[in-house]
Amino acid sequence: MDMEVKTMPGKISIPRRFIFSEGKAIEHPDYPHYSNLLQKMNMPSVKGLEDRHNCVRFEKKCNPTFLKFHPYPPSVLPDYHLHYPYPPPYGRAYPLAPLRDDVPLGDPCSGFMSPGGDANLKPNIGRAIPNLVSFHDVKPQNRVPRPDKGFQTTIKRQTILAEELKQDRRWNSRKVPDISIKAKLGGWTSPMKVVPVPVHEHEVGTLSRIYTFDEEAISTDDSEPLVQLDKKYNIKDSFYKSSTQKAYEDVPWDKMLPPKLDPEETTVEKAADHISQCFSLKRYERLPAITQMVGGLWDRFQTRLFSAPAKPINFVSPSTRSKYIPLYTGHVQSTDADNVDNPYGDIKSVASPRHSKLQYTNSSRSANIPGYTGKVHFTATHPTNSNIPSREPSADSEMNRLLLQEMRVDRFRHQGPMSQMVTTVKPYNPFNKKEKETLEY
């Protein structure tokens, strides 16, 4: 097919191959499938198609690819606005240059959104990009994530976060929580009014007792002398005093103790199993990770030690369309054999992993539980454990029994060459059932 443009007066004809020119320049069959995943992962992208660093971006003059670059066809043509394909107007789909639609929006150095990509998306168009200035230099570990829905919950969490940041988070033994002060003053620490439990009479005497400490005690109630270990020892020194509290404050508890645990975002359990009451996550994920679906380009940019045991590292699946686990060496099937090599072919029809299913058991006829492996007659319509009265034998059952015994075939049929051999000398053939005949002369 001629690759040049065939121009006719008043009409532009474009070869059919250029309509699918994107598949022409792609050598790797999985590139169109993981190119979108690379943008989500902020992976450093190569320049140009086919990883050639834009060395083949120069096209011939009058190439139909340049029609997409111009916002409108030349106005000298009659009915230029009716020609196909009509180039897109200025906007998100407007290309920057011929064959350069894959413009990376992320900065390859920092990994964040580049200023050019931020300006290209424009405000109020497409996906909203969060502004980093609105967080007021809050550390990531102190930032409260936004819930999926609920505007009032977001404002409440931001208010709590602002109050916690203003407070001194260092350990202080003299600090008294506000909730304890409210409890001592008789205030309510809960939104609902709590009615105190009445005290019984036998507990009043116990609560009203006052225990005193007698330092000068010499003997116990049993008139036994106390054992004094040391005269210099003072029992009141073991009390908790302000000096003891001051000594504890000198200890760097913030460095010795683990940090305070922040409350969870939600109390919803992850992957809760209501049958086994096992609240652990599943061992195997249902779908492969994004890093396992981007092809060999992940290993290309992944930094590893030079002392790696095996190279290349087969960490990802060789085909992103097969949806198989990495290191899978089986055969990827498809309804059409040509779709395996076609980058736009459909191989998901039969490439999904198989799941073992129980064999179908017709329980409506045999009345047995599914998966029963006992002995049941193939024409029986009753369960095996049902009590069925035995029938009387028929008149010809004895005759059938004799016929079966006569028709019974021996297990060892002696069909081998040694068994069929006939010997005329002793000990003769042990399998020869012919009777011996005496010949008279």
UniProtKB/Swiss-Prot annotation:
One of its GO terms (biological process) is spermatogenesis. Disruption phenotype: Mice have smaller testis and show impaired spermatogenesis. It holds the Pfam family SPATA48. Testis specific. Expressed at the spermatid stage. It comes from the Eukaryota. Keywords: Differentiation, Spermatogenesis. PANTHER family: SPERMATOGENESIS-ASSOCIATED PROTEIN 48. Essential for normal spermatogenesis. This is Protein SPMIP7. It comes from Mus musculus. The lineage of its organism: Eukaryota, Metazoa, Chordata, Craniata, Vertebrata. The gene is Spmip7.
